[in-house]
């Protein structure tokens, strides 16, 4: 799926707002993901055996959260370019062995959309939920085609 220049600008702007406090945003995303889907926590080696409340301040969790958010940053940077397909293939290859499939990417997208919405609401910034939801549907489909 291709996104308009305005949509790309919107998601990148929202993303910049989130990265102002990347650690807090990352913890919130994973908190939402695991609250909604507790069984997903076992798919993350860095999070196994940790209470969701213990993610914050755990060096292994922090490292993995930054990796995940870095991957999202790569996707946003590659929107509407051929590089996006390369990223999708890589992510599919990295996640399939752990059973992280299209549905898990959709659910992660929902957690990210909720966290971004909360962050934008607190800062008074605009948030285009429909564009973000379309983006994560596209991401899940893009990765899913290689699994």
Curated annotation (Swiss-Prot):
Residues 2-147 form the Globin domain. Keywords: Heme, Iron, Metal-binding, Muscle protein, Oxygen transport, Transport. It comes from the Eukaryota. Coiled coil: none annotated. Heme b binds at residues 64, 95. The keyword Calcium does not apply. InterPro entries: Erythrocruorin, Globin, Globin-like_sf, Globin/Proto, Mb-like_M. GO terms for molecular function: heme binding; metal ion binding; oxygen binding; oxygen carrier activity. Homodimer or homooligomer. Adapted to the low-temperature environment by a decrease in the oxygen affinity via an increased ligand-dissociation rate. At 2 degrees Celsius this hemoglobin has an oxygen affinity similar to other hemoglobins at 25 degrees Celsius. Belongs to the globin family. PANTHER family: GLOBIN-LIKE PROTEIN. This is Globin. It comes from Aequiyoldia eightsii (Antarctic yoldia). The lineage of its organism: Eukaryota, Metazoa, Spiralia, Lophotrochozoa, Mollusca.
